[in-house]
Amino acid sequence: MAVPRERPYVQFNFLVDLGDGKGTDGTQAGFQECSNIGMEVTVAEYRNGNEVENSVRKITGLNKSTDVTLKRGVIGSLNLYSWLNDIRSGKQDAYRTVTIHLQNEDHTAVVQTWKLLRARIIKHVSGPMNAKGTDVAMEELTLSYERLEME
């Protein structure tokens, strides 16, 4: 699904599908920021005492996914709270596949997709609030997931 080209794509046209199936076009929430999409493969270092070379072997270890942060203005919806409440209540079906689509400049095509498999909210923060402030009231959501797929 990725659409390669010579010139890099801009970062500001993206859609987030929270995986609850309630959106008419697949997107349940607009976010201002989405950061830290990533994965790593850990490495275990190992060496026998009788090795000929004075170096360690690097053995492929476990896969790890980074926690993703989503930020948006407060819109008065309790959908994210309901999802978090399901998770903290121990509901086993509360895990979702969250999909992030990067779009081209004129919003006519998805050029890259990241799928966060078995995702769950692990942190929700609202604020800050300031009586003299003029900024938008914000909320921040942190997602943990078990596997990342890219298309």
Question: What name fits each language-model region?
Answer:
Residues 1-151:
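Glycine-rich, low-complexity intrinsically disordered segments
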